[in-house]
Amino acid sequence: MKEFFRLSRKGFTGRDDVDSAQIPDDLWVKCSACRELIYKKQLNDNLKVCPKCGHHMRMSAHEWIGLLDVGSFREMDSNLLPTDPLGFVAADESYATKLAKTQQRTGMTDAVISGVGAISGIRLCIAVADFSFMGASMGSVYGEKMARAAERAAELGIPLLTINTSGGARQQEGVIGLMQMAKITMALTRLAEAGQPHIALLVDPCYGGVTASYPSVADIIIAEPGANIGFAGKRLIEQIMRQKLPAGFQTAEFMLEHGMIDMVVPRSEMRETLARILKHYQQRQAPAAKADLAARRATLPQPIM
């Protein structure tokens, strides 16, 4: 019997002997909220919302563009490239080097993708921020793409949808990053003058100069459940004020309760909600457009009978 335990286990084909190369590393994803493991395909099929706790995970700009009608998106201003106006160098690397590395890793030129598309057949301009590109920090290209999207929407006479996530202004560009707040907001005034709506969607996280500027003056402000929205972070505020902030502070639900946003919409209902809003605006504008046309016709010279 003792010899049995000395036998070679050479023929054992248990789990430990399975070639690890045959098992992809990204089959499973751990939810950052409930810490449960989720099959990646199941997560993607559920729009990156945890099926166990409902936590909304971050999506890329390209994934958000999936809200649009299939085949309707046409990217604009993809030729805009960021520069290094200050020759900024941090302790470990230069801004130029960091940009190049981030561009190679993400396949994006900067943090925003913009263009023209449609939802339920209704044309609109769209600009989407991607947190994976330097925390979607707002620099010159970010601001220029957002401003051009607003101006294009005004020119075409169609609504603007912005999907916003950010850590704030891009520090490596100094005051140029900060001035994008005013630049985008001014472009949005031209959109308002054209009688077209700006719908802003806030997704986790949305902080700093982005929250403090153009999304907060949108005609309709939507947020995802549990999204963190604010100017400075909760920890920093507590340190400065030296007092504990209320539970749920800076969450989408807290913002809704205090009148800072208009609605909190789960990702599974987002496309349907946006379609309903766009149709509402379209129906409201139709009579106004007819009245405007009649008014312009009235100014034309009348034929002599």
UniProtKB/Swiss-Prot annotation:
GO biological process terms, alphabetically, are:
fatty acid biosynthetic process; malonyl-CoA biosynthetic process
Residue stretches making up the CoA carboxyltransferase N-terminal domain: 27-296
The record's keywords, sorted A to Z, are: ATP-binding, Cytoplasm, Fatty acid biosynthesis, Fatty acid metabolism, Lipid biosynthesis, Lipid metabolism, Metal-binding, Nucleotide-binding, Transferase, Zinc, Zinc-finger
Instruction: Look up the domain of life of the source.
Output: Bacteria
Q: Which Pfam families match?
A: Carboxyl_trans (PF01039), Zn_ribbon_ACC (PF17848)
Q: Which residues bind Zn(2+)?
A: 31, 34, 50, 53
Q: Output the Gene Ontology terms for molecular function.
A: acetyl-CoA carboxylase activity; ATP binding; carboxyl- or carbamoyltransferase activity; zinc ion binding
Q: What is its EC number?
A: 2.1.3.15
Q: In which pathway does it act?
A: Lipid metabolism; malonyl-CoA biosynthesis; malonyl-CoA from acetyl-CoA: step 1/1
Q: Which GO terms describe its cellular component?
A: acetyl-CoA carboxylase complex
**Residue ranges of the C4-type zinc fingers?**
31-53
Q: What chemistry does it catalyse, as a reaction equation?
A: N(6)-carboxybiotinyl-L-lysyl-[protein] + acetyl-CoA = N(6)-biotinyl-L-lysyl-[protein] + malonyl-CoA
Q: Which PANTHER family match?
A: ACETYL-COENZYME A CARBOXYLASE CARBOXYL TRANSFERASE SUBUNIT BETA, CHLOROPLASTIC (PTHR42995:SF5)
Q: How does it assemble?
A: Acetyl-CoA carboxylase is a heterohexamer composed of biotin carboxyl carrier protein (AccB), biotin carboxylase (AccC) and two subunits each of ACCase subunit alpha (AccA) and ACCase subunit beta (AccD).
> This chain belongs to which protein, by name?
Acetyl-coenzyme A carboxylase carboxyl transferase subunit beta
